[in-house]
Amino acid sequence: IMKNPIMKNPIAKKSIAKNYLYNLAYQILVMLLPLITTPYISRVLGANNIGIYSYTLSITTFFILFGSLGVALYGQREIAYHQNNKEKYSRLFLEIIILRFATMFISFIIYYFNFINGSNEYSIYYKILILEIISNVIDISWFFQGLEEFKKIVLRNTFIKIISLILIFVLVKTSNDLPVYFWIYAASLFFGNISLWFYLPK
């Protein structure tokens, strides 16, 4: 009878338990924060601005998903498979980054000519959301997920969300602050994703 090596390895079991707890704590935070921010944002920005935010964000997210083409999921799986071979996963990392850049560049060109390069009434918001697209290109959380280093991701995400929460209450005061709200959202993604690069193995 084949036995699961994880069940025989207390270190592996401990690692799985820690990763589960990190993710559980983060998911609880993700559920709680909207309970704090949503009533405030809805009251300050108003229904019309919330509609603009949701609409432009959904359009941008579509192009991000189109440009991603499952690259992150593929990268996570391949890194996990070769996590004990540094030379192999280092090469895979570079290949996936190049592939991600190429696919997102094609998606961005379509996005640019349809929503920015013209007289679109929401072009100012689409321009801000370019930062979200860039954030997606430089997102390497899939790499750390493949290496099962969830602590770095969870701590990064938690810190960024708390900072964003503070900035929302400090900077978003009236319905005229919709661009500020966009900037807080996009900048938090950008700085959160770029911070992971400092934790890459040497």
Regions found by a protein language model. Name each.
Residues 62, 66, 101, 112-113, ...:
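Alpha-helical transmembrane segments of multi-pass membrane proteins
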Residues 16-36, 40, 97, 126, ...:
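Hydrophobic faces of transmembrane alpha-helices in multi-pass small-molecule transporters and flippases
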